[in-house]
Amino acid sequence: MNSTALAVLLVRGKLPQYEPWRIVFSDTGEERPETYAYMRDHFEPWLAKHGKTLEVVRPDETILERWERLKVTGSRLLRGCTVEGKIKPIERHVAANGGGVQLIGVDAGEAHRMPDRVRPLVDLDIDREGCEAIIKAEGLPSPGKSGCWCCPFMRVGEVIRLAKVDPCKFERIARLEDIATETHGPQPNGQPRTQWGDKPASYWRERAGQGDIFYDEGRLSDDSPHCGCYDG
């Protein structure tokens, strides 16, 4: 959402101080299917109409491949997936292209995030609603939430929906939890290692079978902030 609004401002010449600029998408390899569809069907054609192209960078391995190689579940504290899957690929790309200033799509409602980065939306006091208005005025549909389909910060309803509509992906996480527990032992509290909150995949699988509760959007943990790349 925010990055799309920032791109609109750049394309429309509202941020001339950053000319010339390039738009780079850091693809973790595990983005939500809806994100890939939006980029393909809306964002990239819109950029092309304005004579711009989207540059895509990727890590050497997807974040899930990395977890599987290390035999660990995603960490809600270390946030290594953001660093390895998002930040490092972009930093390598920028360095390989002669360096430059990185503009981050953080809005004014998230001013506490990445205070050491250049954040035009924060500087212009544009919040999430403002971003939505900018995108709508441009004639683009809302990109919706972004983030990885396996993100440890997913909301309750999102985890249950994954178990319902894409059981193959869900079971991949279930296997990862089992392997992580077998390899590294249980958590300090004696419970198995988990990807989403303090409940194992079996719990979410059971809830998914109890009926349509897609609209349960509570957070997995009230004291656990979102990661740096999950826009939910």
Question: What do these predicted ranges mean?
Answer:
Residues M1-G232:
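Nucleotide-activated chemistry modules centered on ATP-dependent adenylation/adenylyltransferase
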